[in-house]
């Protein structure tokens, strides 16, 4: 098997694990374990906490003491055990701590999988710029396949989804032992601990434009987590209406939600055109408007013919909402930051989005869901309209508050990756 194919298998399993539970665990906790919205939000906030502290720490370990593929193997071995135990947990506080341990082991594997891929491709004499994107696409495929499997097997409200994720983690841990050895980087005496942790990038907050950018990254990061947490429970709640109880939306909500991931792949291909033609500010603004539409379509969507079209449109615009912000934001950081702290700045960007933003978004969205619930019945239309209003508010403030002059030549030859 070629190294490219071996890495595709790794990428497939990496995101298959996540897809097994990320969008359905909320439904399991709400409908089966009867957790509150705040409980569910707290459990999902573990992802944000782990994203803040773990990638930098694990990066130091992989750089200094442990080969990357071995660190990757150990992380997934921990995930396998923790996810197996999580399937038996029924207390919300315990679920938070268990999923926090899982997140602290899993979140570093995203960066480690990229590092392993780049190193293996370099060892094989392949150009990562052209060879890596097809490998990463297999990750999206793995995520979608897992969602479909859990949905078709009717496991969305069952703890078995966690057993599936545990088994896949164990398989990937064993598979990692077969990967080529990744040499430990030689120590550089001039590299400080703060630099390794990405803390030197905090100097960017002295620049007003960069400070505003990172602030918006955090606030929009809060939006990214909302549909992962509550999109699936929202669709399951249509079962309360006898008219929709046997509908496709209620029976297979994850299959419908997987259209969002499919849309991601399509919108990725359009990013170079939009960046060059309209500039980063406009592309990021389009993302915020797309988030407004995402939530707005959810507010008025249902399993009826017209309502289903709105739900489908919500899934499609998700691709724009997610990709246009994450990737254009990364390109902006690449352009604006000095090369000496560029890697740290990219890490700070991801920490603000997937760490602080995701943590805040998980907790506040859970509180909002509870606030607009009466006797366990959620007013989903109001909930989604509140989230849509928040995204629209961000778009308006961003339009007037973020200054950026578009120069097509700056991004003419810049590669865009996801």
UniProtKB/Swiss-Prot annotation:
Cited SUPFAM superfamilies: MFS general substrate transporter
Catalytic activity: xanthosine(in) + H(+)(in) = xanthosine(out) + H(+)(out)
Gene3D superfamilies per the UniProt record, alphabetical: MFS general substrate transporter like domains (1.20.1250.20)
InterPro entries in UniProt: MFS_dom, MFS_trans_sf, Nuc_H_symport
Signal peptide positions (record): none
Phenotype seen when the gene is deleted: Mutant grows very slowly on xanthosine.
Organism domain of life: Bacteria
Entry's Gene Ontology BP terms: nucleobase-containing small molecule metabolic process; nucleoside transport
Entry's Gene Ontology cellular component terms: membrane; plasma membrane
Keywords: Cell inner membrane, Cell membrane, Membrane, Symport, Transmembrane, Transmembrane helix, Transport
Positions in the Periplasmic compartment: 31-41, 158-159, 231-254, 299-306, 370-381
TM stretches of this protein: 10-30, 42-62, 71-91, 92-112, 137-157, 160-180, 210-230, 255-275, 278-298, 307-327, 349-369, 382-402
Subcellular location: Cell inner membrane
Molecular function (Gene Ontology), one example: cytidine transmembrane transporter activity
Membrane topology according to the record: Multi-pass membrane protein
Homology family: Belongs to the major facilitator superfamily. Nucleoside:H(+) symporter (NHS) (TC 2.A.1.10) family.
Role played: Uptake of xanthosine. Can also transport other nucleosides such as inosine, adenosine, cytidine, uridine and thymidine. Transport is driven by a proton motive force.
Protein name: Xanthosine permease
């Amino acid at each position: 098997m070629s190294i490219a194919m071996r890495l595709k298998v790794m990428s497939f399993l990496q995101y298959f694990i996540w897809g097994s539970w990320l969008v359905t665990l909320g439904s399991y906790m709400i409908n089966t374990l009867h957790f509150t919205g705040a409980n569910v939000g707290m459990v999902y906030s573990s992802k944000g906490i782990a994203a803040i502290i773990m990638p930098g720490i694990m990066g130091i370990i992989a750089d200094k003491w442990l080969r990357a593929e071995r660190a990757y193997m150990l992380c997934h071995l921990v995930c396998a055990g923790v996810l197996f135990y999580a399937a038996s947990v029924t207390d919300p506080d315990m679920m938070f701590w268990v999923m926090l341990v899982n997140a602290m082991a899993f979140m570093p594997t995203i960066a480690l999988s990229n590092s392993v891929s780049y190193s293996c491709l370099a060892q094989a004499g392949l150009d990562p710029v052209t060879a890596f994107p097809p490998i990463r696409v297999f990750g999206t495929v793995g995520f979608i396949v897992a969602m479909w499997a859990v949905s078709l097997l009717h496991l969305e409200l069952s703890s078995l989804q966690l057993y599936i994720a545990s088994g896949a983690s164990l398989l990937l841990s064993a598979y990692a032992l077969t990967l080529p050895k990744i040499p430990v980087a030689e120590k550089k005496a001039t590299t400080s601990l703060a630099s390794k942790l990405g803390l030197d990038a905090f100097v960017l907050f002295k620049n007003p434009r960069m400070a505003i950018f990172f602030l918006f990254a955090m606030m929009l990061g809060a939006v990214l987590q909302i549909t992962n947490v509550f999109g699936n429970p929202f669709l399951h709640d249509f079962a309360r209406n006898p008219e929709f109880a046997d509908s496709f939306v209620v029976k297979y909500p994850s299959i419908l939600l997987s259209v969002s991931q499919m849309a991601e792949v399509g919108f990725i291909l359009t990013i170079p055109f939009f960046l060059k033609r309209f500039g980063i500010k406009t592309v990021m603004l389009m993302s915020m408007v797309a988030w407004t539409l995402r939530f707005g379509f959810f507010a008025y969507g249902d399993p009826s013919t017209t309502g289903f079209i709105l739900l489908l449109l919500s899934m499609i615009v998700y691709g724009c909402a997610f990709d246009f912000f994450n990737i254009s934001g990364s390109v902006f950081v690449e352009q604006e930051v000095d090369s000496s702290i560029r890697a740290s700045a990219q890490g700070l960007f991801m920490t603000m989005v997937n760490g602080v933003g995701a943590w805040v978004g998980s907790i506040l969205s859970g509180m909002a869901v509870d606030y607009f619930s009466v006797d366990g019945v959620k007013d989903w239309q109001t909930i989604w309209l509140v989230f849509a209003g928040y995204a629209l508010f961000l778009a308006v403030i961003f339009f007037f508050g973020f200054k950026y002059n578009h120069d097509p030549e700056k991004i003419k030859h810049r590669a865009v990756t996801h």
